[in-house]
Amino acid sequence: MNMNEKFRIAIVGCGGMGSGHAVALKSGTGETVYMGNVSDAKMPDSAMTTHLGNLIELAGITDIDPLRMEWAVSQGVFVYSSYEEMLADKSVDAILIATPNHLHKSMAIAALRAGKHVLCEKPVMLSSADLLEVM
């Protein structure tokens, strides 16, 4: 990655945590909002943009829930049709995993094998043995 390029993060899982991360990354503010219902969420005013927007950007999201995908599109977020498509995107530097906990291990392994950096919601894995296996 060139130092003049933005670090591109893609999010798998766009529920409560993933959508909050999407808002923070898309807005450039680094600020998140709590959303009880993802369809009610709105991106913050771009006038709030901080230096964060000069360093990183949201590459896109994917989710198995069509309503969450529709929300992302309505917010101007690129949507990947599958996790595999996201992993194949050479412009993506990192994957932020915000899926149910039992999926973290397999998704992290797949992302690492695809050459991506991994950010994972807590708990990072279901056990320390799983984490050691991933590392």
Residue map of PLM features:
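Conserved SAM-binding strand-loop segment of SAM-dependent methyltransferases
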Residues: 77-85
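N-terminal Rossmann-like dinucleotide-binding module
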Residues: 1-75
